[in-house]
Regions:
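Acyl-donor (CoA/ACP) binding surface of acyl/acetyltransferases
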Residues: 1-26, 30-35, 70-187
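Hydrophobic residues in alpha-helical segments
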Residues: 31, 41, 63-64
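Conserved GNAT-fold acetyl-CoA-binding loop/helix
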Residues: 36-58
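A short helix-loop-beta-strand connector motif used in the catalytic cores of GNAT acetyltransferases and
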Residues: 57-72, 81
């Protein structure tokens, strides 16, 4: 894996770039304070913009490390979401994604577009061997995003994630670099 860090990514409709502490109000308003948008992520909804500012301060500090991959997702000068590598296993060259999109932007293909763009960056530029993601089985829409982005279902891991309701199951999806190359050749 090449430690290339968080570089800007452009798609047809979106810009993915590093977070700034100045993004706190938009992040809070558009996703971090929304109980539905944060229902299946590992962090609780933020009670105020100060909590968002504190989180972003830590994320921005993390950019000093080239193994940090964490993007703000922009549509027409508005922050609509976040995507990051939440775990890396260097033994097998694997990167696990996590993402959150503001509810107003659901069902427009933005999440799939974001995941595809970051997978391309990780597989082609950072040279990971595998990108994976997981979702709560109750979050069917997130599973569809992963499948639409080209990932395949790998299995269910029971009671492996802790949230405010207790232990939860996770459905795993993944894509190998060799599979990615095959998909690109078919396009």
């Amino acid at each position: 894996m090449k430690l290339v860090g968080t570089c800007p990514i452009h798609t047809d409709r979106l810009v993915l770039r590093r977070w700034s502490v100045d993004d706190a109000q938009q992040m809070y308003d558009n996703l971090a304070s929304d109980t539905e948008a944060t229902r299946f992520v590992t962090w609780p909804p933020h009670p105020n913009v100060d909590a968002t500012r504190l989180l972003l301060t830590g994320w921005v500090r993390g950019y000093d490390d080239p193994d940090t991959f964490n993007w703000a997702v922009w549509l027409d000068e508005v922050i609509i979401g976040q995507i990051a590598v939440v775990d890396v296993d260097t033994r097998v060259n694997l990167a696990e994604l996590g993402y959150c999109l503001g509810k107003r932007w659901w069902n427009h293909g933005y999440a799939t577009e974001t995941v595809k763009a970051v997978m391309s960056y990780l597989l082609d530029t950072a040279k990971v061997n595998k990108v994976e993601d997981r979702h709560d089985p109750a979050n069917i829409a997130s599973g569809r995003v992963m499948e639409n982005a080209g990932m395949v279902i790998e299995g269910l891991r029971r009671a492996c994630v802790m949230d405010s309701c207790g232990p939860r199951d996770s459905q795993y999806h993944g894509l190998l670099r060799s599979e990615w190359r095959g998909q690109q050749a078919d396009d």
